[in-house]
Amino acid sequence: MILREIRNKYGLTQKEAASLIGIPYRTYVRYEESDSFSNSYKYRKMVEDLGNLLRIDESHGILKLDHIKTTLIPILKSHNISFCYLFGSYARGDASQTSDVDLLVDADITGFDYLSLVEEIRQALSKKIDLLRLCDLKPGNPIIVEILKEGVRIL
C-alpha cells in the first residue's frame, strides 16, 4: 500500500497519479489496490517514479496553495504573527520548481527570533523563503499595495 500512501500524502487522485507517471489509469488502480503486485518490479518502479516526481525540496517540486496555508498557520500563530500574505509566483499560480515562497508578515520580531521564524518556515515547506516584515516597508510603499491587492491572505 506504499503507492496509495504516497498518492494520499500529496493529495492526488488515482487518475492524477497515473498521468504523472505515464501509465494507464486502470493499470494504476489495479497496482494500487492489490497487494499481489507489491513485490513486482513494475510496482517498485511506480513507487520510485511517483516519489521522485512529487519530491519537494528547494529545487524540486511545486507546493500546493492549500499545503502552504495548512503548514504556515500553526507556525505563524506560535510566533504571534497578526497577519501574513503570500505574494509572488506562488500567489500568482505560476511558481516553478525553483521558486521561493514570498511572504509579508506583520510581526514585531527581530534578530534571532526573526531568523528562527524564517528557518522554521523553510524547514516546514522545504523551500527557500523570502520573508518581509511590514514594519520594514515605508507606509504607502507600492509593494505593500500590490501585495495586499494581489497576494493571498494566509492568516
Task: Kindly label every feature range from the protein language model.
Residues 1-83, 92-96, 108-155:
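Catalytic core of pol beta-like nucleotidyltransferases
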Residues 88-90:
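Short helix-loop-helix/strand-helix junction enriched in hydrophobic and basic residues
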Residues 99:
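Short beta-strand-loop elements within alpha/beta enzyme cores
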